């Protein structure tokens, strides 16, 4: 029997046939995001744009998330061709849904496939079948089910083209024995990867490849999911060509067609207006505190530091204290978003109230809210810096708004984004240590908000922001959306794929022999 693990990896190449519209049937597209806010939000924006273009859209979310998305009725009312369906995520109600905790990822990977198959069968038994599925690149089961039903698939990657490219270099790094790594240095440089010379570190790698102590099965599954996306007929990215040209070129050798529609939030606003019923306003999982906008109105231009760590990050009480005192010590006014669940085993509001009493200046300098409309805050003229976890949505939104960043990455694509923000694009500062201390926070704030470095960073940011917004003003990033409409299949006939290589094959088959090799098991 042929040993597939012994394949010549240098000859691997996959080319799906292009999408081929083929009948008079009205297109009906189903969108299925991974159930995390950073994924749901861009998917909703895309759903709006497709609906506005006249395509009937079914937006599929987990039951848990659907309950948390506020006012979906308003979205459905504004976009009559936008419909919502739900699916269980397979977890108990009190189970953590944080991606870093693992259970949600494994449940979505393994548990939702039968339910997704049933949903597609039910929809296709009706008068108006699904003609195309746009799936999150982190979910491979929709691709498998789509192939069973003969439905074309488009993959949507909510992260950067750069971070996606890293996934496709993982088999090479495993084969070379560079990962899993043997020592305890999580920020050691990865050698010999094209496009990343001197810029790729271990903590930039996806999944637990960046964490020696973590369960490596998470990484196997994650890479396997991504490689499966190679079977999709096209790829959608929330980026623009000038921002990531080398990585888009690399991905074009893997995917048959790529749509770059970023900055997606700015495109949506330009096309649909700044409405309270837009995805940007409705996809938050916490109630927005609008009082912060009035507070910003009273601050001098470019004086405020906006602090937000996204929808999933948690910190310890002492880490929150260090952040608070670092912000206060900087002497800069700040608007800080702290979710009620941001502190592990504690209540953020109580801690903040206690610290504000201890440090009287804090109440005068800053404002704390549980949640804010990030796009609106970043666009406010009073905001001069963004202390961020460097998620891709936050990065793109900050670039579009022209706001320099202070990078405090935690996991996933965030460390890689932070390195590019600091060392490549030069539009922010990256923390140079892994400590949570007030001095580091104070130094970062001052570095970004004062002196010559501030001038240089702001100049670089203005150039990049201009490029991003030119796409919106001139409608350049709308062109791929129009092309996407044209290319959206109007029939459920699945284009025949020609498999010339292993793109999309099971990940364990690619590296099975290498995983067992001594280079990967040394202590």
From Swiss-Prot:
Binding site for UDP-alpha-D-glucose: 311, 374, 392-394, 397, 413-414
Keywords: Transferase
InterPro entries in the cross-refs: UDP_glucos_trans, UDP_glycos_trans_CS
Reaction catalysis annotation: mogrol + UDP-alpha-D-glucose = mogroside I-A1 + UDP + H(+); mogroside I-A1 + UDP-alpha-D-glucose = mogroside IIE + UDP + H(+); mogroside IE + UDP-alpha-D-glucose = mogroside IIE + UDP + H(+); mogroside II-A1 + UDP-alpha-D-glucose = mogroside IIIX + UDP + H(+)
Active-site residues from the entry: 39, 136
Cleavable signal peptide: none
Tissue: Highly expressed in young fruits 15 and 34 days after anthesis (15-DAA and 34-DAA).
EC number(s) on file: 2.4.1.-
GO molecular function terms noted in the UniProt entry: quercetin 3-O-glucosyltransferase activity; quercetin 7-O-glucosyltransferase activity
Pathway where this protein functions: Secondary metabolite biosynthesis; terpenoid biosynthesis
More info: Mogrosides, the major active constituents of S.grosvenorii fruits, are a mixture of cucurbitane-type triterpenoid glycosides that have been proven to be powerful and zero-caloric sweeteners and can hence be used as a sucrose substitute for diabetic and obese patients.
Function noted in UniProt: UDP-glycosyltransferase involved in the biosynthesis of cucurbitacin and mogroside tetracyclic triterpene natural products (e.g. siamenoside I and mogrosides IV, V and VI). Cucurbitacins have cytotoxic properties and exhibit deterrent taste as a defense barrier against herbivores. Mogrosides are nonsugar highly oxygenated compounds used as high-intensity zero-calorie sweeteners; they also possess pharmacological properties such as regulating immunity, lowering blood sugar and lipid levels, protecting the liver, and acting as antioxidants and antitumor agents.
Protein name as it appears in the record: Mogroside I-A1 synthase
């Amino acid at each position: 029997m042929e040993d597939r693990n012994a394949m010549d990896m240098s000859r691997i190449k996959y080319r799906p046939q292009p999408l081929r519209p083929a009948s008079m049937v009205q297109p009906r597209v189903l969108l299925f995001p991974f159930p995390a806010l950073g994924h749901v939000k861009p998917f909703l924006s895309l759903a709006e744009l497709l609906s506005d273009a006249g395509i009937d859209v079914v937006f599929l979310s987990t039951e848990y998330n659907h309950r948390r998305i506020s006012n979906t009725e308003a979205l459905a009312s504004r976009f009559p061709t936008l419909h919502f369906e739900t699916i269980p995520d397979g977890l108990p109600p009190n189970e953590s849904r944080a991606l870093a905790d693992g259970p949600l990822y494994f449940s979505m990977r393994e548990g939702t496939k039968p339910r997704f198959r049933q949903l597609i069968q039910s929809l296709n038994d009706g008068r108006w079948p699904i003609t195309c599925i746009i799936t999150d690149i982190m979910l491979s089961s929709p691709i498998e089910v789509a192939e069973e039903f003969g439905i074309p698939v488009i993959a949507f990657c909510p992260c950067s083209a750069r971070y996606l490219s890293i996934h496709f270099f993982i088999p090479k790094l495993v084969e070379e024995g560079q990962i899993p790594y043997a020592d305890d240095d999580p920020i050691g440089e990865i050698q010999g990867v094209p496009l990343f010379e001197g810029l790729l570190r271990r903590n930039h790698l996806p999944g637990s490849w960046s964490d020696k102590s973590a369960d490596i099965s998470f990484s196997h599954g994650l890479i396997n999911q991504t490689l499966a996306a190679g079977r999709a007929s096209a790829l959608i990215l929330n980026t623009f060509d000038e921002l990531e040209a080398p990585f888009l070129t690399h991905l074009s050798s893997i995917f048959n067609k790529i749509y770059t529609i970023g900055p997606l939030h700015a495109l949506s606003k330009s096309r649909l207006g700044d409405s309270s019923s837009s995805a940007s306003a409705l996809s938050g999982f916490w109630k927005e505190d609008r009082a912060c906008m009035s507070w910003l109105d009273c601050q001098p231009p470019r004086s405020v530091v906006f602090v937000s760590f996204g929808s999933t990050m948690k910190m310890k009480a002492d880490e929150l204290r260090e952040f608070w005192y670092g912000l206060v010590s900087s002497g800069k006014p700040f608007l800080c978003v702290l979710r009620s669940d941001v502190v592990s085993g504690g209540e953020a509001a109580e801690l903040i109230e206690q610290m504000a009493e201890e440090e009287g200046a804090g109440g005068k300098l800053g404002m704390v809210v549980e949640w804010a409309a990030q796009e609106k805050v970043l666009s406010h003229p009073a905001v001069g810096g963004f202390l961020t976890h460097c998620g891709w949505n936050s990065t793109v939104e900050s670039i579009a708004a022209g706001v320099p960043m202070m990078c405090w990455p935690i996991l996933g694509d965030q460390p890689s984004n932070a390195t590019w923000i600091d060392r490549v694009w030069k539009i922010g500062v990256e923390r140079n240590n892994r400590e949570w201390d007030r001095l580091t926070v104070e130094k970062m704030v001052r570095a970004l908000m004062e002196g010559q470095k501030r001038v240089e960073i702001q100049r670089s940011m203005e150039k990049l922001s201009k490029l991003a917004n030119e796409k919106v003003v001139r409608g350049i990033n709308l062109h791929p959306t129009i092309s996407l409409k044209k290319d959206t299949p109007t029939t459920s006939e699945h284009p025949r794929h020609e498999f010339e290589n292993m793109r999309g094959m099971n990940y364990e088959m690619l590296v099975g022999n290498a995983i067992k090799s001594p280079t990967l098991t040394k202590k």
